[in-house]
Amino acid sequence: MAASASAAAGEEDWVLPSEVEVLESIYLDELQVIKGNGRTSPWEIYITLHPATAEDQDSQYVCFTLVLQVPAEYPHEVPQISIRNPRGLSDEQIHTILQVLGHVAKAGLGTAMLYELIEKGKEILTDNNIPHGQCVICLYGFQEKEAFTKTPCYHYFHCHCLARYIQHMEQELKAQGQEQEQERQHATTKQKAVGVQCPVCREPLVYDLASLKAAPEPQQPMELYQPSAESLRQQEERKRLYQRQQERGGIIDLEAERNRYFISLQQPPAPAEPESAVDVSKGSQPPSTLAAELSTSPAVQSTLPPPLPVATQHICEKIPGTRSNQQRLGETQKAMLDPPKPSRGPWRQPERRHPKGGECHAPKGTRDTQELPPPEGPLKEPMDLKPEPHSQGVEGPPQEKGPGSWQGPPPRRTRDCVRWERSKGRTPGSSYPRLPRGQGAYRPGTRRESLGLESKDGS
Protein backbone atom coordinates (compact mmCIF):
# COMPACT_ATOMS: atom_id res chain seq x y z
CA MET A 1 0.00 0.00 0.00
CA ALA A 2 2.83 2.38 0.83
CA ALA A 3 4.63 1.66 -2.48
CA SER A 4 1.53 2.31 -4.55
CA ALA A 5 0.89 5.52 -2.69
CA SER A 6 4.44 6.71 -3.28
CA ALA A 7 4.17 5.86 -7.02
CA ALA A 8 0.92 7.80 -7.30
CA ALA A 9 2.50 10.73 -5.51
CA GLY A 10 5.48 10.56 -7.91
CA GLU A 11 3.26 10.64 -11.00
CA GLU A 12 1.43 13.62 -9.60
CA ASP A 13 4.76 15.40 -9.11
CA TRP A 14 5.91 14.53 -12.72
CA VAL A 15 5.77 17.67 -14.83
CA LEU A 16 5.70 15.97 -18.26
CA PRO A 17 1.93 15.39 -18.55
CA SER A 18 1.11 18.97 -17.68
CA GLU A 19 3.76 20.29 -20.06
CA VAL A 20 2.42 18.15 -22.90
CA GLU A 21 -1.07 19.56 -22.35
CA VAL A 22 0.28 23.10 -22.63
CA LEU A 23 2.13 22.21 -25.88
CA GLU A 24 -1.00 20.66 -27.42
CA SER A 25 -2.94 23.83 -26.68
CA ILE A 26 -0.27 25.95 -28.40
CA TYR A 27 0.57 23.89 -31.50
CA LEU A 28 -2.80 22.16 -31.83
CA ASP A 29 -2.69 19.50 -34.53
CA GLU A 30 0.96 20.06 -35.39
CA LEU A 31 1.99 18.20 -32.24
CA GLN A 32 1.76 14.40 -31.97
CA VAL A 33 2.37 12.63 -28.66
CA ILE A 34 2.88 8.92 -28.09
CA LYS A 35 2.44 8.33 -24.37
CA GLY A 36 4.29 5.54 -22.65
CA ASN A 37 3.19 3.28 -19.77
CA GLY A 38 3.57 5.80 -16.99
CA ARG A 39 7.19 6.39 -16.10
CA THR A 40 8.37 2.92 -17.14
CA SER A 41 8.65 3.73 -20.89
CA PRO A 42 9.67 7.05 -22.57
CA TRP A 43 7.19 9.35 -24.26
CA GLU A 44 7.70 10.41 -27.89
CA ILE A 45 6.77 13.87 -29.20
CA TYR A 46 6.69 14.63 -32.97
CA ILE A 47 6.33 18.11 -34.48
CA THR A 48 7.06 19.45 -37.98
CA LEU A 49 8.79 22.82 -37.89
CA HIS A 50 8.73 25.55 -40.57
CA PRO A 51 10.28 29.01 -40.76
CA ALA A 52 8.27 31.85 -39.23
CA THR A 53 6.96 33.61 -42.38
CA ALA A 54 3.59 34.92 -41.08
CA GLU A 55 1.81 31.83 -42.43
CA ASP A 56 3.09 32.44 -45.96
CA GLN A 57 3.67 28.87 -47.00
CA ASP A 58 5.08 29.82 -50.40
CA SER A 59 8.05 31.49 -48.69
CA GLN A 60 8.87 28.51 -46.48
CA TYR A 61 11.73 26.77 -48.24
CA VAL A 62 13.10 24.59 -45.44
CA CYS A 63 11.55 22.30 -42.83
CA PHE A 64 12.20 19.19 -40.75
CA THR A 65 10.41 16.98 -38.20
CA LEU A 66 11.69 17.25 -34.63
CA VAL A 67 11.47 14.05 -32.53
CA LEU A 68 11.87 14.23 -28.72
CA GLN A 69 12.08 11.02 -26.67
CA VAL A 70 11.41 12.05 -23.07
CA PRO A 71 12.82 9.63 -20.45
CA ALA A 72 11.15 8.78 -17.10
CA GLU A 73 13.66 10.91 -15.17
CA TYR A 74 12.68 14.07 -17.06
CA PRO A 75 13.35 16.97 -16.34
CA HIS A 76 16.49 15.83 -14.52
CA GLU A 77 17.61 13.96 -17.66
CA VAL A 78 18.04 15.40 -21.13
CA PRO A 79 15.57 14.09 -23.77
CA GLN A 80 16.98 12.33 -26.85
CA ILE A 81 16.76 14.68 -29.87
CA SER A 82 16.62 13.56 -33.55
CA ILE A 83 15.65 15.12 -36.90
CA ARG A 84 13.65 13.31 -39.59
CA ASN A 85 12.55 14.22 -43.12
CA PRO A 86 14.71 17.33 -43.58
CA ARG A 87 13.97 19.47 -46.66
CA GLY A 88 16.32 22.07 -48.06
CA LEU A 89 19.00 21.41 -45.47
CA SER A 90 22.47 20.03 -45.94
CA ASP A 91 24.08 17.44 -43.72
CA GLU A 92 26.25 20.08 -42.13
CA GLN A 93 23.23 22.22 -41.28
CA ILE A 94 21.42 19.26 -39.73
CA HIS A 95 24.46 18.41 -37.63
CA THR A 96 24.69 22.05 -36.47
CA ILE A 97 21.00 22.13 -35.49
CA LEU A 98 21.39 18.99 -33.39
CA GLN A 99 24.38 20.46 -31.57
CA VAL A 100 22.54 23.72 -30.81
CA LEU A 101 19.46 21.90 -29.48
CA GLY A 102 21.66 19.68 -27.33
CA HIS A 103 23.28 22.69 -25.69
CA VAL A 104 19.84 24.21 -24.99
CA ALA A 105 18.64 20.98 -23.37
CA LYS A 106 21.68 20.71 -21.13
CA ALA A 107 21.27 24.34 -20.08
CA GLY A 108 17.64 23.73 -18.96
CA LEU A 109 18.16 20.62 -16.81
CA GLY A 110 15.67 20.47 -13.91
CA THR A 111 13.11 22.69 -15.64
CA ALA A 112 10.55 22.33 -18.47
CA MET A 113 12.58 22.55 -21.69
CA LEU A 114 10.36 21.10 -24.44
CA TYR A 115 8.89 24.42 -25.48
CA GLU A 116 12.34 26.02 -25.62
CA LEU A 117 13.63 23.21 -27.87
CA ILE A 118 10.73 23.61 -30.33
CA GLU A 119 11.07 27.37 -30.57
CA LYS A 120 14.83 27.17 -30.99
CA GLY A 121 14.32 24.83 -33.95
CA LYS A 122 11.91 27.28 -35.58
CA GLU A 123 14.36 30.12 -35.06
CA ILE A 124 17.17 28.20 -36.79
CA LEU A 125 14.91 27.43 -39.78
CA THR A 126 13.90 31.07 -40.10
CA ASP A 127 17.54 32.15 -40.21
CA ASN A 128 18.38 29.51 -42.83
CA ASN A 129 15.31 29.90 -45.04
CA ILE A 130 17.40 29.44 -48.19
CA PRO A 131 17.38 26.01 -49.82
CA HIS A 132 20.73 24.32 -49.82
CA GLY A 133 21.72 22.14 -52.73
CA GLN A 134 21.33 22.27 -56.48
CA CYS A 135 18.53 22.49 -58.98
CA VAL A 136 18.10 18.89 -60.10
CA ILE A 137 17.25 20.07 -63.63
CA CYS A 138 20.27 22.29 -64.39
CA LEU A 139 22.51 20.97 -61.57
CA TYR A 140 23.51 24.49 -60.50
CA GLY A 141 23.20 25.97 -57.03
CA PHE A 142 20.83 28.74 -55.95
CA GLN A 143 21.99 32.34 -55.68
CA GLU A 144 20.46 35.09 -53.54
CA LYS A 145 18.76 37.10 -56.31
CA GLU A 146 17.69 34.17 -58.49
CA ALA A 147 14.03 33.28 -59.00
CA PHE A 148 13.38 29.77 -57.72
CA THR A 149 10.28 27.94 -56.55
CA LYS A 150 9.35 25.24 -54.07
CA THR A 151 7.00 22.34 -54.74
CA PRO A 152 4.49 21.05 -52.13
CA CYS A 153 6.92 18.15 -51.56
CA TYR A 154 9.67 20.65 -50.63
CA HIS A 155 11.86 20.26 -53.69
CA TYR A 156 13.43 23.33 -55.21
CA PHE A 157 13.97 24.38 -58.83
CA HIS A 158 14.78 27.48 -60.78
CA CYS A 159 11.57 28.94 -62.18
CA HIS A 160 13.00 28.99 -65.70
CA CYS A 161 14.21 25.38 -65.45
CA LEU A 162 10.89 24.15 -64.07
CA ALA A 163 8.95 25.93 -66.85
CA ARG A 164 11.01 24.17 -69.53
CA TYR A 165 10.55 20.83 -67.77
CA ILE A 166 6.77 21.29 -67.57
CA GLN A 167 6.53 22.18 -71.28
CA HIS A 168 8.52 19.10 -72.23
CA MET A 169 6.43 16.79 -70.03
CA GLU A 170 3.16 18.22 -71.38
CA GLN A 171 4.25 17.45 -74.95
CA GLU A 172 5.19 13.89 -74.00
CA LEU A 173 1.92 13.34 -72.15
CA LYS A 174 -0.01 14.61 -75.15
CA ALA A 175 1.81 12.23 -77.49
CA GLN A 176 1.27 9.29 -75.13
CA GLY A 177 -2.42 10.18 -74.82
CA GLN A 178 -2.88 10.02 -78.58
CA GLU A 179 -1.19 6.62 -78.78
CA GLN A 180 -3.21 5.16 -75.90
CA GLU A 181 -6.54 6.64 -76.95
CA GLN A 182 -7.80 3.42 -78.50
CA GLU A 183 -6.69 1.34 -75.54
CA ARG A 184 -8.51 3.61 -73.13
CA GLN A 185 -11.73 3.36 -75.14
CA HIS A 186 -11.71 -0.45 -75.01
CA ALA A 187 -10.60 -0.61 -71.37
CA THR A 188 -13.26 -1.67 -68.88
CA THR A 189 -12.04 0.71 -66.17
CA LYS A 190 -11.11 4.26 -66.96
CA GLN A 191 -7.66 5.22 -65.79
CA LYS A 192 -7.20 8.63 -64.29
CA ALA A 193 -5.02 10.93 -66.35
CA VAL A 194 -1.65 11.59 -64.75
CA GLY A 195 -0.36 15.15 -64.88
CA VAL A 196 3.15 16.53 -64.61
CA GLN A 197 5.03 14.97 -61.72
CA CYS A 198 7.93 16.13 -59.60
CA PRO A 199 11.22 15.05 -61.20
CA VAL A 200 12.52 13.97 -57.78
CA CYS A 201 9.71 12.16 -55.93
CA ARG A 202 7.02 11.81 -58.69
CA GLU A 203 4.41 13.70 -56.72
CA PRO A 204 1.81 15.63 -58.79
CA LEU A 205 2.84 19.25 -59.29
CA VAL A 206 0.63 22.30 -58.84
CA TYR A 207 2.06 25.10 -60.97
CA ASP A 208 1.34 28.29 -62.87
CA LEU A 209 3.13 27.93 -66.18
CA ALA A 210 2.70 31.58 -67.21
CA SER A 211 4.38 32.94 -64.08
CA LEU A 212 7.18 30.38 -64.32
CA LYS A 213 7.90 31.32 -67.94
CA ALA A 214 8.00 35.01 -67.02
CA ALA A 215 10.85 34.44 -64.56
CA PRO A 216 14.33 35.45 -65.76
CA GLU A 217 16.86 32.85 -66.76
CA PRO A 218 19.39 32.09 -64.02
CA GLN A 219 22.81 33.62 -64.57
CA GLN A 220 25.53 31.16 -63.74
CA PRO A 221 29.04 32.46 -63.06
CA MET A 222 31.56 31.63 -65.76
CA GLU A 223 34.63 30.01 -64.30
CA LEU A 224 37.75 30.42 -66.41
CA TYR A 225 39.91 27.32 -66.45
CA GLN A 226 43.58 27.96 -65.79
CA PRO A 227 45.72 24.83 -66.04
CA SER A 228 48.47 24.42 -63.51
CA ALA A 229 52.12 23.72 -64.25
CA GLU A 230 51.68 20.02 -63.44
CA SER A 231 48.77 19.65 -65.84
CA LEU A 232 50.73 21.39 -68.60
CA ARG A 233 53.67 19.04 -68.06
CA GLN A 234 51.38 16.02 -68.26
CA GLN A 235 49.84 17.32 -71.48
CA GLU A 236 53.26 17.65 -73.12
CA GLU A 237 54.26 14.18 -72.01
CA ARG A 238 51.06 12.65 -73.38
CA LYS A 239 51.51 14.55 -76.63
CA ARG A 240 55.00 13.10 -77.14
CA LEU A 241 53.73 9.63 -76.28
CA TYR A 242 50.90 9.98 -78.79
CA GLN A 243 53.27 11.06 -81.57
CA ARG A 244 55.62 8.17 -80.86
CA GLN A 245 52.79 5.65 -80.95
CA GLN A 246 51.45 7.18 -84.13
CA GLU A 247 54.84 6.88 -85.85
CA ARG A 248 55.06 3.20 -84.89
CA GLY A 249 51.53 2.43 -86.06
CA GLY A 250 50.07 1.96 -82.59
CA ILE A 251 47.22 4.45 -83.07
CA ILE A 252 44.12 3.15 -84.85
CA ASP A 253 42.48 5.72 -87.10
CA LEU A 254 38.76 5.10 -86.77
CA GLU A 255 37.93 7.00 -89.95
CA ALA A 256 40.45 5.02 -91.98
CA GLU A 257 39.28 1.71 -90.50
CA ARG A 258 35.68 2.64 -91.25
CA ASN A 259 36.47 3.40 -94.91
CA ARG A 260 38.81 0.46 -95.45
CA TYR A 261 36.25 -1.57 -97.41
CA PHE A 262 34.48 1.45 -98.91
CA ILE A 263 34.22 1.35 -102.68
CA SER A 264 33.61 4.67 -104.42
CA LEU A 265 31.54 4.59 -107.61
CA GLN A 266 32.37 8.14 -108.67
CA GLN A 267 35.60 7.17 -110.43
CA PRO A 268 35.21 3.74 -112.04
CA PRO A 269 38.43 1.72 -112.15
CA ALA A 270 40.18 1.18 -115.47
CA PRO A 271 39.20 -2.10 -117.19
CA ALA A 272 41.89 -4.66 -116.48
CA GLU A 273 42.98 -6.83 -119.39
CA PRO A 274 42.74 -10.57 -118.68
CA GLU A 275 46.14 -12.07 -118.13
CA SER A 276 45.29 -15.22 -120.07
CA ALA A 277 44.21 -13.28 -123.16
CA VAL A 278 46.39 -13.74 -126.24
CA ASP A 279 46.64 -11.25 -129.03
CA VAL A 280 44.68 -12.31 -132.09
CA SER A 281 47.48 -11.16 -134.30
CA LYS A 282 49.66 -13.93 -132.94
CA GLY A 283 47.35 -16.52 -134.45
CA SER A 284 49.03 -16.19 -137.83
CA GLN A 285 52.46 -17.03 -136.41
CA PRO A 286 53.74 -20.59 -136.39
CA PRO A 287 53.36 -22.56 -133.15
CA SER A 288 57.10 -22.63 -132.50
CA THR A 289 57.32 -18.82 -132.54
CA LEU A 290 54.21 -18.52 -130.37
CA ALA A 291 55.58 -20.98 -127.81
CA ALA A 292 58.86 -19.06 -127.64
CA GLU A 293 57.03 -15.77 -127.04
CA LEU A 294 54.83 -17.28 -124.34
CA SER A 295 57.82 -18.83 -122.59
CA THR A 296 59.79 -15.56 -122.53
CA SER A 297 56.82 -13.42 -121.46
CA PRO A 298 57.03 -12.67 -117.68
CA ALA A 299 53.28 -12.10 -117.41
CA VAL A 300 52.49 -15.56 -118.69
CA GLN A 301 55.13 -17.17 -116.51
CA SER A 302 53.73 -15.48 -113.41
CA THR A 303 50.14 -16.49 -114.13
CA LEU A 304 50.71 -20.10 -115.15
CA PRO A 305 50.36 -22.59 -112.28
CA PRO A 306 53.20 -24.94 -111.36
CA PRO A 307 53.37 -28.13 -113.39
CA LEU A 308 51.55 -31.16 -112.03
CA PRO A 309 52.99 -34.69 -112.15
CA VAL A 310 51.09 -36.03 -115.14
CA ALA A 311 51.90 -38.94 -117.38
CA THR A 312 54.21 -38.32 -120.32
CA GLN A 313 52.28 -37.97 -123.53
CA HIS A 314 53.34 -39.71 -126.73
CA ILE A 315 52.10 -38.31 -129.96
CA CYS A 316 52.78 -40.24 -133.08
CA GLU A 317 53.06 -38.70 -136.45
CA LYS A 318 49.76 -38.49 -138.19
CA ILE A 319 49.03 -39.01 -141.75
CA PRO A 320 49.63 -35.73 -143.55
CA GLY A 321 46.64 -33.99 -144.94
CA THR A 322 44.17 -35.17 -142.33
CA ARG A 323 43.72 -31.80 -140.68
CA SER A 324 44.42 -28.23 -141.65
CA ASN A 325 47.24 -26.18 -140.20
CA GLN A 326 44.77 -23.71 -138.68
CA GLN A 327 43.15 -26.41 -136.52
CA ARG A 328 46.56 -27.63 -135.36
CA LEU A 329 47.57 -24.10 -134.42
CA GLY A 330 44.37 -23.64 -132.38
CA GLU A 331 44.99 -26.87 -130.48
CA THR A 332 48.58 -25.84 -129.79
CA GLN A 333 47.49 -22.51 -128.35
CA LYS A 334 44.79 -24.16 -126.25
CA ALA A 335 47.21 -26.74 -124.87
CA MET A 336 49.73 -24.04 -123.92
CA LEU A 337 47.19 -21.76 -122.22
CA ASP A 338 45.04 -24.33 -120.41
CA PRO A 339 46.46 -25.61 -117.10
CA PRO A 340 47.08 -29.34 -116.88
CA LYS A 341 44.32 -31.43 -115.33
CA PRO A 342 44.80 -34.74 -113.58
CA SER A 343 43.29 -37.87 -115.04
CA ARG A 344 39.74 -38.67 -113.95
CA GLY A 345 40.15 -42.44 -113.98
CA PRO A 346 41.68 -44.53 -111.23
CA TRP A 347 44.62 -45.45 -113.46
CA ARG A 348 47.51 -43.38 -114.75
CA GLN A 349 49.27 -43.64 -118.03
CA PRO A 350 52.61 -45.39 -117.47
CA GLU A 351 55.68 -43.41 -118.33
CA ARG A 352 57.23 -44.29 -121.62
CA ARG A 353 60.65 -43.40 -122.81
CA HIS A 354 62.11 -43.24 -126.29
CA PRO A 355 65.69 -44.41 -126.08
CA LYS A 356 68.15 -43.56 -128.76
CA GLY A 357 68.43 -45.75 -131.74
CA GLY A 358 64.75 -45.75 -132.64
CA GLU A 359 63.77 -48.53 -130.22
CA CYS A 360 60.22 -48.27 -128.95
CA HIS A 361 59.54 -49.83 -125.56
CA ALA A 362 56.06 -50.95 -124.72
CA PRO A 363 54.73 -51.28 -121.16
CA LYS A 364 54.93 -54.65 -119.54
CA GLY A 365 51.85 -56.73 -119.10
CA THR A 366 49.97 -55.44 -122.16
CA ARG A 367 48.46 -58.07 -124.36
CA ASP A 368 46.45 -56.18 -126.94
CA THR A 369 49.32 -54.17 -128.33
CA GLN A 370 49.46 -53.06 -131.91
CA GLU A 371 52.77 -53.46 -133.63
CA LEU A 372 53.94 -51.56 -136.66
CA PRO A 373 54.11 -53.42 -139.96
CA PRO A 374 57.54 -54.49 -141.14
CA PRO A 375 59.24 -52.14 -143.60
CA GLU A 376 59.05 -53.00 -147.27
CA GLY A 377 62.76 -52.71 -147.82
CA PRO A 378 65.69 -53.78 -145.72
CA LEU A 379 66.14 -51.84 -142.50
CA LYS A 380 69.35 -49.95 -142.94
CA GLU A 381 69.38 -47.76 -139.85
CA PRO A 382 67.19 -47.43 -136.81
CA MET A 383 64.29 -45.08 -137.27
CA ASP A 384 63.87 -42.28 -134.72
CA LEU A 385 60.25 -41.96 -133.68
CA LYS A 386 60.78 -38.58 -132.03
CA PRO A 387 59.08 -35.82 -133.98
CA GLU A 388 60.99 -32.81 -135.11
CA PRO A 389 60.71 -29.87 -132.70
CA HIS A 390 59.88 -27.45 -135.54
CA SER A 391 57.38 -29.67 -137.39
CA GLN A 392 54.17 -27.92 -138.29
CA GLY A 393 51.24 -28.73 -136.04
CA VAL A 394 52.90 -31.67 -134.26
CA GLU A 395 53.11 -31.69 -130.50
CA GLY A 396 56.13 -33.35 -128.98
CA PRO A 397 57.07 -34.34 -125.46
CA PRO A 398 58.47 -31.53 -123.28
CA GLN A 399 62.22 -31.16 -123.59
CA GLU A 400 64.33 -30.78 -120.51
CA LYS A 401 66.05 -27.42 -120.32
CA GLY A 402 67.88 -25.33 -117.77
CA PRO A 403 66.27 -23.87 -114.69
CA GLY A 404 65.88 -20.45 -116.30
CA SER A 405 64.13 -21.58 -119.51
CA TRP A 406 60.94 -23.16 -118.18
CA GLN A 407 58.20 -22.94 -120.79
CA GLY A 408 55.24 -23.76 -118.55
CA PRO A 409 53.46 -27.02 -117.82
CA PRO A 410 53.22 -29.79 -120.40
CA PRO A 411 50.19 -29.62 -122.69
CA ARG A 412 47.05 -31.32 -121.48
CA ARG A 413 46.29 -34.65 -122.96
CA THR A 414 42.99 -34.58 -124.76
CA ARG A 415 41.20 -37.68 -125.88
CA ASP A 416 40.23 -36.60 -129.35
CA CYS A 417 39.11 -39.29 -131.72
CA VAL A 418 39.84 -37.04 -134.68
CA ARG A 419 43.55 -36.98 -133.91
CA TRP A 420 43.77 -40.75 -134.16
CA GLU A 421 42.07 -41.23 -137.48
CA ARG A 422 42.10 -44.57 -139.12
CA SER A 423 44.13 -44.76 -142.31
CA LYS A 424 42.27 -44.90 -145.54
CA GLY A 425 43.85 -48.16 -146.58
CA ARG A 426 42.63 -50.08 -143.51
CA THR A 427 39.36 -51.89 -143.27
CA PRO A 428 37.35 -52.44 -140.06
CA GLY A 429 38.41 -56.07 -139.82
CA SER A 430 42.08 -55.75 -140.73
CA SER A 431 45.02 -55.50 -138.33
CA TYR A 432 48.74 -55.12 -138.51
CA PRO A 433 50.81 -58.31 -138.84
CA ARG A 434 52.56 -59.36 -135.66
CA LEU A 435 56.29 -59.90 -135.50
CA PRO A 436 57.69 -63.18 -134.21
CA ARG A 437 58.63 -63.20 -130.54
CA GLY A 438 62.18 -62.16 -129.98
CA GLN A 439 62.69 -60.38 -133.33
CA GLY A 440 61.26 -57.01 -132.42
CA ALA A 441 62.91 -54.04 -130.73
CA TYR A 442 61.43 -54.95 -127.38
CA ARG A 443 63.61 -56.88 -124.94
CA PRO A 444 61.84 -57.97 -121.76
CA GLY A 445 64.94 -58.10 -119.57
CA THR A 446 66.83 -55.10 -120.84
CA ARG A 447 64.40 -52.30 -119.83
CA ARG A 448 66.13 -51.35 -116.60
CA GLU A 449 69.58 -51.71 -118.16
CA SER A 450 68.74 -49.39 -120.99
CA LEU A 451 67.35 -46.84 -118.55
CA GLY A 452 70.49 -47.05 -116.46
CA LEU A 453 72.66 -46.50 -119.50
CA GLU A 454 70.67 -43.43 -120.44
CA SER A 455 71.11 -41.91 -117.00
CA LYS A 456 74.85 -42.55 -117.04
CA ASP A 457 75.31 -41.05 -120.48
CA GLY A 458 73.30 -38.02 -119.42
CA SER A 459 71.18 -38.15 -122.63
Swiss-Prot record:
Its main location: cytoplasm. Residues 282-303 have a biased composition (Polar residues). Pfam families: RWD, zf-RING_2. Keywords: Cytoplasm, Metal-binding, Phosphoprotein, Transferase, Ubl conjugation, Ubl conjugation pathway, Zinc, Zinc-finger. Zn(2+) 1 binds at residues 135, 138, 158, 161. Its EC number is 2.3.2.27. The modification Phosphoserine is found at residue 450. Changing residue 199 to A: Decreased E3 ubiquitin-protein ligase activity without affecting binding to UBE2D2. Changing residue 161 to S: Strongly reduced activation of NF-kappa-B. Residues 18-128 form the RWD domain. PROSITE patterns: RWD, ZF_RING_2. Residues 268-309, 322-459 are annotated as: Disordered. One of its GO terms (biological process) is protein K6-linked ubiquitination. Belongs to the RNF25 family. Interacts with UBE2D2, and may also interact with UBE2E1 and UBE2E3. Interacts with RELA/p65. This is E3 ubiquitin-protein ligase RNF25. It comes from Homo sapiens.
